Amino acid sequence: MTRSWVGSLIAGTCLLLEVASLASSQQAPAPGVAEEIVLDAQASTRPFPHYWEQVFGSGRAILSLRDSYRRDLRTMKAATDIHYVRFHAIFDDEVGVYSEDAQGRPTYNWSYVDQIYDGLLDNGVRPFVEMSFMPRALAASDKPHAFWYHPLPSPPANYGKWEDLVYNFARHLVDRYGVTEVSQWYFEVWNEPNIDFWTGQPAQATYFELYDHAARAIKRADPRLRVGGPASAQAAWIPDMIAHSTQAKAPLDFVSTHVYGNDLSKDIFGTDENIDRSEMVGRAVQKVANQVKSSARPDLPIIWSEYNASYKNEIDVTDAAFMGPWLANNIRLCDGLTTAMSYWTFSDVFEEQGVIKTPFYGGYGLIAEGNVPKAAFNAFVMLHRLGDRRSQPDLRNSLVTKRSDGSFAIAIWNYAAEGTAGATRSVQVKVTGWQGTPRYHIEILDNDHGSALTAWRAMGSPESPTREQYEQLRRTASATQKLDDTSSFMLPAPGLALVEVRPH
């Protein structure tokens, strides 16, 4: 929650932000691009829900039992507005939920399921339940996926037994936690069935069969539970999903899909257009919003249950200060177009490619091995302090927000492509119409402030840091640049600044 400040802004004040060159006598990086942005505090505002910090992905279900996972989760909970966690493989054999006796009769075991979900709830977080992958005893094929833990992307050998598994799973959760609690969860059927996480043929038709059985089972457990899909990769299948559920009268309480900044235009839009990483997510979100709006279910909630700047391991992307302006820009682009967006992932307690060998390798997580916050984590912490109302939505490189106490929080960013450094911008914030003198607090994230990756490289990029080095990395990770009682600052590229303005 945003800390309340004493006093409030005087009604009818104007806020003017000018981006201009600073005096040549100041010790600063080379002068950057001069730009002027005028912000009017009297402009109308609209609600600005923090849709980007309510759901986060993580490594597969069984990893949530580890102390390191739960430590990272507590770190997230203390710094953001995280409400839900989504992970793969709650039905994987290592969770032990399903087996059959010699006569083929199902046996269910919810021991690890209970420990997994208890661990989330004990830390103030609810499950976003992705129902995957297929238990070996129920799978039509035992050919595994290439992931290190070898999940089975197979259809069930018996769809009736699949439906019974989902029903008994959901019914157990209702019995254990109560329907008042579980009705606030989300149940999502499978993961990315349009690519290699689903081997049914034809893929879409067999997925819809899987979905229909699961959705009926969820509603049979209790009609108040929420179920949706298709959890597709590459923003795919949304119109088909809505059309199918309408025709088949299959329950559908939300639609979900995924996008990554380095997805290809041909996969998202069916074109050869070269779309920059900074724009891909926003473009895909707009596409799906338009599809839902023009469908038979125009008011369906849209949940992006995975997104990130990269689906590959790119150290100068997900581990770097690049993520600050990338995230802020995507918040700007996607505002008003989605119910929630789930960043993949909050932690590098993650083993899809195997056991982590080094803390920085381009992992998806906001928190590196050893509970070391990355620059992207710091960006989420800063953006958490934005207000709950927004004005001036036409601005390209800033978000102007107003808080309930009347203060302002402004995110300003300077984007540069991954692995590059752009021109530094000089920024001056001016406030007019105040009774008295405004006070400023400015926080800046860039390659030299708040980037544990930079500190790790300065150590010589140790593959296995010592305990002392990990402690040093944790200290450095939180060392963003902080400025008080000044309205001027230099913003490197890549860089993200949060400017907080309040009465003196």
Please annotate each region the language model reported.
Residues 8-20:
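Bacterial N-terminal signal peptides
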Residues 304-422:
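Aromatic/acidic polysaccharide-binding cleft in carbohydrate-active enzymes
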